């Protein structure tokens, strides 16, 4: 059977779209049934298997319909209206079933606990352990306990409104069996109803509310989010861990960053990212950027665990709203471990007269050094027209501060307003073209599907 040719009778295929009512039974196409099953097999049951688990399902066949046992197969694989199933006959009434989502892409299920003999099994187990260790490391970064798990947003889990839950988290938290109502909660306390559901294949999914949660919290495909389990409430709560960036309190007080407002991050190429300053009830100031912060770090090669020095040039305050501009600049030397980054933070005054430049330069504050934890190490009063720089060393040790030269002052006075690069427009244009191409491809797939459904309808008539 393993050596059968793809064109041999034992490898004949048929597929069916899942329409309303499919949960109770599934029809085998008349032509396929008459050519490959009718009169050639005495058995009244078929065996179904998938790549989702080692288990097989015995399903009763009444005429050319799959009936008793089909519902259990559907529930085990979370099949839904709009999905497609492809059956490959492997001989002796054994069918391998592949499930496709509405996007016509194969549905991916978490690997089950398969313990086959031989070298291949060993490799699978190692790979699985490594995956669990990676998830554990991500959790450790976000919380001091083990009640966290991380997951990425994908096209598949968005379209299916369901996302898999890591196996190690499931074991720790007791969600490995049955169905459990839960609540998804964002950083601001807004909640969405959902549930954790386990399947016979061993897979555990967070089902319902996922797509809405991602949309309203501006989580895009490729983003990673970490949830912390709060079990004190009657219904378990999966709370999204903070994606904000905390600014040291000593730094914000000295520089008057005490009010919420809009900020714009600009790198050396003057590409812009819009962020917000948020002040909590304790007076702590955060940068909230979500995907924009992630894009900013990626564009400037700032990775997880790396230090980032911020350099603030004090500016004017307008309507109690501070508008700042972070300008990334490449250091003139390469750090010992290659991981130190520097950024310049420049306030943009909204005045348009020529005196704005002079006003901005004359309000420069003292130079402040802080450790990685945000604790002040040494501060000294400097002459006017110098920058306030926040340096964070990778090792957490305080760095030494020095006066900026007059050449730097000259550069500050000639800083140009933040602007969007032309290459960004090119990227937008390219994205639109790609979207139109995808739409055309999808329309072609719909036409093919339409013809097949019309053929099926003719068979029914």
Curated annotation (Swiss-Prot):
GO terms for molecular function: transcription cis-regulatory region binding. The keyword DNA-binding applies. It comes from the Eukaryota. Keywords: DNA-binding, Nucleus, Repeat, Transcription, Transcription regulation. Residues 400-415 have a biased composition (Polar residues). It holds the Pfam family B3. One of its GO terms (biological process) is response to cold. Residues 11-103, 148-244, 230-332 bind DNA. This is B3 domain-containing protein REM9. The lineage of its organism: Eukaryota, Viridiplantae, Streptophyta, Embryophyta, Tracheophyta. The gene is REM9.
């Amino acid at each position: 059977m393993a050596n059968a040719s793809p064109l041999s009778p034992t490898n004949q295929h048929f597929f069916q779209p899942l329409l309303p009512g499919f949960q109770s039974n599934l029809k085998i196409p008349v032509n396929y049934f008459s050519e490959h099953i009718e009169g050639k097999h005495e058995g009244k049951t078929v065996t179904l298997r998938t790549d989702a688990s080692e288990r097989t399902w015995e399903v009763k066949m009444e005429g050319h319909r799959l009936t008793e046992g089909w519902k259990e197969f559907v529930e085990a694989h979370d099949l839904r209206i709009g999905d497609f199933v492809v059956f490959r006959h492997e001989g002796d009434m054994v069918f391998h079933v592949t499930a496709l989502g509405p996007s016509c892409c194969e549905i991916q299920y978490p690997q089950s606990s398969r313990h086959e003999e031989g070298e291949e099994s060993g490799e699978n187990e190692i790979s699985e352990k490594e995956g669990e260790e990676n998830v554990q490391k991500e959790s450790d970064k976000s919380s001091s306990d083990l009640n966290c798990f991380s997951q990425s947003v994908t096209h598949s889990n968005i379209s299916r409104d369901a996302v898999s839950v890591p196996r190690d988290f499931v074991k720790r938290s007791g969600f490995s069996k049955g169905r459990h109502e839960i609540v998804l909660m964002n950083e601001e306390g807004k909640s969405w109803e959902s549930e954790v559901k386990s399947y016979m294949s061993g897979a555990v999914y967070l089902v319902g509310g996922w797509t809405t949660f991602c949309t309203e919290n501006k989580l895009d495909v490729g983003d990673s989010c970490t949830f912390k389990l709060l079990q004190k409430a009657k219904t378990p709560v999966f709370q999204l861990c903070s994606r904000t960036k905390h600014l040291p309190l000593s730094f914000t007080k000295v520089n008057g960053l005490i009010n919420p407002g809009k900020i714009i991050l600009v790198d050396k190429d003057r590409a812009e990212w819009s962020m917000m300053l948020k002040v909590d009830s304790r007076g702590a100031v955060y940068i909230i950027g979500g995907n924009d912060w992630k894009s900013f770090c990626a564009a400037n090669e700032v990775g997880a665990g790396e230090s980032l020095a911020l350099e603030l040039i004090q500016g004017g305050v307008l309507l109690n709203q501070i508008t700042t501009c972070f300008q990334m600049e490449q250091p003139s030397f390469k750090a010992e471990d290659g991981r130190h980054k520097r950024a310049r933070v420049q306030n943009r005054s909204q005045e348009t007269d020529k005196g704005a430049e002079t006003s901005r330069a004359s309000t420069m504050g003292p130079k402040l050094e802080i450790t990685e934890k945000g604790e002040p190490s040494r501060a000294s009063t400097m002459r006017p027209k110098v920058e306030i720089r926040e340096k964070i060393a990778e090792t957490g040790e305080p760095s030494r501060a020095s006066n900026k030269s007059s050449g730097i002052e000259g550069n500050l006075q000639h800083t140009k307003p933040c602007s969007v690069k032309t290459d960004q427009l090119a990227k937008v244009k390219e994205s639109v073209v790609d979207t139109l191409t995808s739409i055309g491809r999808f329309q072609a797939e719909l036409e093919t599907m339409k013809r097949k459904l019309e053929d099926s309808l003719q068979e029914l008539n």
